[in-house]
Amino acid sequence: MSSQICRSASKAAKSLLSSAKNARFFSEGRAIGAAAAVSASGKIPLYASNFARSSGSGVASKSWITGLLALPAAAYMIQDQEVLAAEMERTFIAIKPDGVQRGLISEIISRFERKGFKLVGIKVIVPSKDFAQKHYHDLKERPFFNGLCDFLSSGPVIAMVWEGDGVIRYGRKLIGATDPQKSEPGTIRGDLAVTVGRNIIHGSDGPETAKDEISLWFKPQELVSYTSNSEKWLYGDN
């Protein structure tokens, strides 16, 4: 939603600024727009109100109008720095040994790709029992902990890092419920798995978990930052 707002705001700002012929209007609006952008990030009080109070009533009215019209410019200025930065995120996804042995690698990857998410890290690894225990450390008090770790370390795992707008939250929706019997049709587990003990895939359940799991499974140099050709069609304002 915020991306759509910023794209609409940026279009309005470009149209407004390209048609502005009054130099004073342009400079005042630009200043107020810049201040509004900073105010939106909570750094300083809104400049427009101070500007209005320090001017005469006629000028004050004009300044408020100028500031109002400059708000799209403010949104345009902050969208790349804060809004998009907050939305573009990374998550850890692993295809478990059962998913690998059943030949579901391409099927699972294609579902993330078709959604528009970007693969920035991938490798095949057979994790040790100790490594599996680190991965499932938050479940160490559960009765099924040892069995879970034994299974994860029983064969090759496809470890991946995916990037995209809302990839953590939507990735979990795409995967489905932990129990495949409770997963909706159309989800990976709902379509491809049968039992909890063999639910073929793991996905980070939140930003902090994603950060921890990515750092556990990958070294920084194993992740690649790049711009795909599809991004302008997914996120662009064209």
From Swiss-Prot:
ATP binds at residues 96, 144, 172, 178, 189, 199. It comes from the Eukaryota. It is an enzyme of class 2 (transferase). Pfam families: NDK. It catalyses: a 2'-deoxyribonucleoside 5'-diphosphate + ATP = a 2'-deoxyribonucleoside 5'-triphosphate + ADP; a ribonucleoside 5'-diphosphate + ATP = a ribonucleoside 5'-triphosphate + ADP. GO terms for cellular component: chloroplast thylakoid lumen; cytosol; mitochondrial inner membrane; mitochondrial intermembrane space; mitochondrion. Its cofactor is Mg(2+). The keyword S-adenosyl-L-methionine does not apply. The active site is at 202 (pros-phosphohistidine intermediate). Its main location: plastid. Keywords: ATP-binding, Chloroplast, Kinase, Magnesium, Metal-binding, Mitochondrion, Nucleotide metabolism, Nucleotide-binding, Plastid, Thylakoid, Transferase, Transit peptide. It is found in: Plastid, Chloroplast thylakoid lumen; Mitochondrion intermembrane space. Its EC number is 2.7.4.6. Belongs to the NDK family. This is Nucleoside diphosphate kinase III, chloroplastic/mitochondrial. The gene is NDPK3.
